[in-house]
Every structure is written in structure tokens, then in C-alpha cells.
């Protein structure tokens, strides 16, 4: 069992049950899945870029990424419908908790000029989105092996009904949210 999964089961459930006033253990919010997405629009000109992006994503997540394709043609971006333009990975269960552990304790502290995560990035239904500008904050990525620095989007989907419940859940996992000053 992953370290954060055990922490959730032993500590977080009881904390949130008291704080949110949940009647049942099953009513306590939990993390459903984590989705990682890299959009590589520059891959239109060079197909090798997409292979490198998918390799980076596989090393970061520990899972083979799925190719994402353009839904419709956009002349301004010089892309056609159904062209490969990025990749994504959906993590659940044990792999999700292991990635979350690495994200909170290793990757986020390595972000340059980090002042905390924005508490405004919730979507209104308790899910959290964050963007990362550099994939080199993850220890799995070797700085000498990358061809370009790329960002990614990380979406944490929870069963929380409101942003306050979602934020309470992520704070219980020690997410470094920015405090209002």
C-alpha cells in the first residue's frame, strides 16, 4: 500500500469527517484520479518531438501515455483534424498515490521561485488544476537528456462537492497552498 494511501485511510478520513461533519466514512471526499496532460503543438512539424514527449511522460508517471489528437482543424495553429498534438495519462489507485507523494514531497519543492500553489485553481466542484512550466522538476527526468523544456497540466479529480471540501482534502495531504497576505 502506498504511503499516502495509508495516511488517507488512517488519518485524513477521521480529520475530514470531524471538520466537514460527514455521517459516513464513504461521504468523506477522496481523490478519484490524477490526469497529466502535455500539449506538444510543435509536434506538427516534427514527429520525433512527440516520441520524446511520450517518453518523458512515461518516465514521470510510470505508465504508458495515450496520444491526444486534434478535434478539429485550426488554420491559425497550422493543425488538421485528427493530427497527434500531445499525450495524457490517467493515474488511479496505487500509482496515483505514489505519484501524488512524489509531486508533493519532491517535485513541487524543486520549482524555482515557488511561493505556494494558488487556492483559486479549483473548478467549482472540488477538482484542482495546476500547471507546471518545466518537466525537469521531476527526478525521473535527466536534465542532460531532454531536448526542450516543456510544461504540463495536472488535474486532481476528487469526489468533493465544493471547492472548500476539495481544499480541505488537499490540505490534509499537506499541499503547499499559498496563504493570503
Curated annotation (Swiss-Prot):
Keywords: Ribonucleoprotein, Ribosomal protein, RNA-binding, rRNA-binding, tRNA-binding. GO terms for biological process: translation. InterPro entries: Ribosomal_uL5, Ribosomal_uL5_bac-type, Ribosomal_uL5_C, Ribosomal_uL5_CS, Ribosomal_uL5_dom_sf, Ribosomal_uL5_N. PROSITE patterns: RIBOSOMAL_L5. One of its GO terms (cellular component) is ribonucleoprotein complex. One of its GO terms (molecular function) is structural constituent of ribosome. It comes from the Bacteria. The keyword Iron does not apply. It holds the Pfam family Ribosomal_L5. The keyword Cytoplasm does not apply. Coiled coil: none annotated. This is one of the proteins that bind and probably mediate the attachment of the 5S RNA into the large ribosomal subunit, where it forms part of the central protuberance. In the 70S ribosome it contacts protein S13 of the 30S subunit (bridge B1b), connecting the 2 subunits; this bridge is implicated in subunit movement. Contacts the P site tRNA; the 5S rRNA and some of its associated proteins might help stabilize positioning of ribosome-bound tRNAs. Part of the 50S ribosomal subunit; part of the 5S rRNA/L5/L18/L25 subcomplex. Contacts the 5S rRNA and the P site tRNA. Forms a bridge to the 30S subunit in the 70S ribosome. HAMAP family: Ribosomal_uL5_B (MF_01333_B). This is Large ribosomal subunit protein uL5. It comes from Nitrosococcus oceani (strain ATCC 19707 / BCRC 17464 / JCM 30415 / NCIMB 11848 / C-107). The lineage of its organism: Bacteria, Pseudomonadati, Pseudomonadota, Gammaproteobacteria, Chromatiales.
